[in-house]
């Protein structure tokens, strides 16, 4: 008895409280009568993990069985961590005459009696096998939490309700409680702070779960969702000494605690079952200007600077990196936690109107390398898939970086917000441009957009996320119906005889009856003029207008990029572009796949405001199967191939980050293995091999991988191709981390002057 009293005194102490936040526990139990979607499933799972319950056997939890008084006392003792004490109390004489010494719960009942958790039912009896009532169960739980002097039964009922123990339960206070309902109450009680009384006042302590779970203090850094180097099922944390490590995540979602100090409570198998948030200094604001180094700026009148720890982690656009590796862009939403962890969302490098629907396999948005779809692409806003981004959407583009500053992903926020109406007013004040659409005033992004808005004209404008007009929507028409080439009109052309011959997008000639009164003054057109037209309900031509075409005499076409260029102007060709070739045998319809690389093209182009071609008419263009292209690559292997009595060389190369093979027309005399090369391809075969421009023996003083820039010792800067590689002279793939200030390198550049191969030479 003396030892028991001593132990009771020890386990009755309390600790300081931390503000707690509930964490759901997934429903994983061995019990066949507990379904994963049952309302009590997660509660039973945590009680089982903490060894508070082992079920009723067979293997079942007994969700619909009534709770007995002996079972309830056992639950309470185990929740308080008193299982060992109860085992010791078996040797004590039974406290109640109806609980024999060999009763399975005699130790539990003796201990509860000694601790004041149970007083029996009177006349020296405990009534261990009687069915427990709802209010009685609440009384046992509240006593375990340390509450005293509550009125029976409504004082207990009210306190349980205030603590959130009975949410969703609708039981009569004198009704029998079942094990499934009790599991909910016990599980909720685990997260309630225990109380003790000081000078008659309640003082909160640690949550009840602290009695049965081990605890440790951590700062949460990342899960696999924020850093793919973290193993699935683990979470990266800083321990109390500031050391980075990983622990099991268990069945707890740690994402809601990123950057915060927490107390992690773990069960008998070591997996977390509850997280209590510690004291954290949290400040949130909108970034007022681009960050400089490790200094960020509030969006207030003074652009208040906040210097964060040089080694601070930052969850930047959803991925973990270091603050020194990124620039927090103006307008981003910033949360700083304890001055050593930042959460930055909406940090965008660029924004733009989308000109073409995004297709599967597209490497860039708008075929612009500033909008490369690199790594894992996360799309939010109006759509959630990159292939759901459409022409006339407005997008914000940002990147994700790892802790070394490498780009690992792309983030895109999509705004699909257009307003159609009449321009009713325009104004300008200093550098602020305004326009009203149907008398609703909008700010206009710039002078170029503002100049396109004509009062009295109906338009569809594109808005950004701040409801600013950023462009005019290109109108989508059915090209097969609306565009044609004027061939001729009838002679005579009168009210009694009015016909017009047009060449349609499929190159077929069609003669239309015309509504003379509608078109008589519009058909004085030269043969070959590109026009738009409409017909009435009877199929008669009732309008014809010359399209605004642009003639070019020396255009070039690039098949891989699907672009037609003349000088500095680029036009984008799509599957919807009407393509015709005017040959000596008449007009021929072309498909996009018919177009090959070509130069010195004589063309007429009709395009929208974004240079997306609606109609392209070539004049005697020759698109044959012969295509010539240039490839900048690094040769990883060379093989001589013998086929049907002939021999040719096959090169295996790294091109734009991908392994490819190219065949020469004959056997090559030179071995190009482990060399950077320029391949001229004709019909996808090697016609010529040259060596690219190289800067030899360079040493680097700065490597800015985030912005794809490097600087040598002469302070000369080089831009890196997005798909650059680093190798040594033996062809082994390396990384930028292998280059120090004393490392000599050769820099091989492509046709636009960007470094595509860095070769380490020492």
Swiss-Prot record:
Record key words, sorted: Cell wall, Glycoprotein, Repeat, S-layer, Secreted, Signal
Span of domain SLH: 27-90, 92-155, 156-204
Region forming the signal peptide: 1-26
Post-translational modification: Glycosylated; contains 8% carbohydrates, which correspond to about 40 to 50 sugar molecules per monomer. O-linked glycans consist of Glc, GalNAc and GlcNAc.
Keyword match Manganese: no
Glycosylation site residues: 297, 516, 520, 632
InterPro entries: SLH_dom (IPR001119)
GO cellular component: extracellular region; S-layer
Localization of this protein: Secreted, Cell wall, S-layer
Pfam short name (any one): SLH
Biological role stated in the UniProt entry: The S-layer is a paracrystalline mono-layered assembly of proteins which coat the surface of bacteria.
UniProt protein name: Cell surface protein
Organism: Thermoanaerobacter kivui
């Amino acid at each position: 008895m003396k030892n028991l009293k001593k132990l009771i005194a020890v386990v009755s102490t309390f600790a300081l409280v931390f503000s707690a936040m509930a964490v759901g526990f997934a429903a994983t139990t061995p019990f066949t009568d507990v379904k994963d979607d049952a309302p009590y499933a997660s509660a039973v799972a945590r009680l089982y993990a903490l060894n508070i319950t082992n079920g009723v056997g067979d293997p079942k939890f007994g969700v619909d069985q009534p709770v007995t008084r002996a079972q309830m006392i056992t639950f309470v003792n185990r929740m308080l961590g008193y299982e060992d004490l109860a085992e010791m109390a078996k040797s004590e004489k039974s406290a109640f005459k109806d609980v024999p010494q060999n009763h399975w719960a005699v130790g539990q009942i003796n201990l509860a009696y000694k601790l004041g958790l149970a007083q029996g039912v009177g006349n020296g009896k405990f009534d261990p096998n009687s069915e427990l009532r709802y209010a009685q169960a609440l009384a046992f739980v509240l006593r375990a939490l340390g509450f005293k002097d509550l009125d029976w039964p409504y004082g207990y009922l009210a306190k349980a309700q205030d603590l959130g123990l009975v949410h969703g339960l609708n039981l009569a206070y004198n009704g029998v409680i079942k094990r499934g309902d009790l599991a909910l109450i016990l599980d909720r009680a685990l997260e309630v702070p225990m109380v003790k009384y000081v000078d008659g006042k309640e003082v909160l302590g640690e949550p009840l779960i602290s009695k049965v779970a081990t605890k440790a203090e951590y700062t949460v850094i990342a899960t696999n969702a924020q850093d793919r180097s973290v193993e699935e099922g683990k979470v990266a944390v800083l321990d109390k000494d500031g050391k980075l490590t990983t622990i099991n995540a268990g069945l707890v979602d740690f994402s809601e605690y990123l950057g915060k100090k927490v107390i992690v409570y773990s069960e008998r198998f070591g997996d977390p079952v509850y997280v209590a948030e510690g004291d954290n200094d949290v400040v949130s604001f909108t970034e007022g200007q681009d960050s400089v180094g490790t200094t960020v700026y509030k969006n207030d009148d003074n652009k208040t600077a906040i210097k964060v720890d040089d080694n601070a982690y930052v969850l930047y656009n959803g991925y973990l990196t270091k603050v020194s590796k990124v620039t927090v862009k103006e307008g981003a939403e910033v949360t700083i936690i304890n001055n050593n962890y930042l959460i930055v969302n909406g940090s965008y490098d660029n924004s733009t109107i989308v000109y073409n629907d995004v297709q599967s396999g597209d490497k860039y948005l708008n075929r612009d390398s500033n909008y490369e779809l690199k790594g894992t692409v996360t799309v939010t806003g109006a759509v959630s898939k990159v292939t759901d981004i459409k022409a006339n959407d407005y997008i914000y583009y940002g990147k994700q970086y790892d802790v070394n500053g490498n780009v690992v992903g792309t983030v895109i926020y999509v705004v699909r917000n257009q307003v159609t109406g009449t321009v009713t007013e325009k104004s300008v004040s200093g550098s602020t441009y305004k326009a009203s659409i149907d008398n609703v005033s909008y700010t206009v992004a710039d002078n170029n957009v503002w100049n396109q808005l004509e009062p009295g004209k109906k338009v569809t404008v594109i808005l950004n996320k701040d409801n600013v007009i950023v462009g005019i929507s290109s109108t989508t028409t059915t090209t097969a119906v609306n565009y044609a080439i004027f061939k001729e009109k009838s002679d005579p052309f009168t009210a009694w005889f009015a016909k017009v011959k047009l060449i349609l997008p499929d190159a077929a000639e069609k003669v239309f009856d015309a509504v003379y009164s509608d078109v008589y003054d519009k058909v004085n057109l030269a043969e070959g003029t590109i026009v738009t037209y409409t017909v009435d309900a009877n199929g008669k031509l009732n309008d014809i207008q010359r399209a605004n075409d642009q003639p070019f005499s020396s255009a070039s076409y690039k098949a891989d990029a699907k672009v037609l260029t003349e000088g500095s102007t680029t036009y984008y060709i799509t599957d919807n572009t009407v393509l015709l070739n005017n040959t000596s045998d008449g007009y021929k319809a072309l498909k996009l796949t018919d177009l090959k690389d070509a130069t010195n093209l004589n063309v007429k182009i009709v395009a929208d405001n974004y240079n997306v071609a609606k109609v392209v008419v070539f004049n005697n263009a020759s698109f044959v199967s012969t295509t010539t292209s240039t490839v900048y690559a690094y040769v990883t292997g060379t093989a001589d191939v013998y086929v049907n009595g002939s021999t040719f060389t096959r090169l295996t190369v790294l091109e734009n980050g991908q392994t490819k093979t190219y065949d020469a027309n004959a056997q090559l005399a030179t071995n190009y293995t482990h060399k950077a090369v320029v391949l001229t391809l004709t019909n996808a075969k090697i016609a010529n091999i040259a060596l690219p421009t190289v800067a030899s023996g360079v040493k680097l003083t700065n490597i800015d991988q985030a912005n794809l820039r490097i600087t040598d010792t002469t302070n000369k800067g080089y831009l890196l191709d997005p798909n650059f590689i680093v190798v040594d002279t033996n062809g082994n793939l390396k990384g930028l981390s292998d280059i120090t200030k004393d490392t000599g390198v050769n820099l091989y550049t492509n046709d636009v002057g960007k470094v595509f191969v860095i070769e380490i030479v020492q």
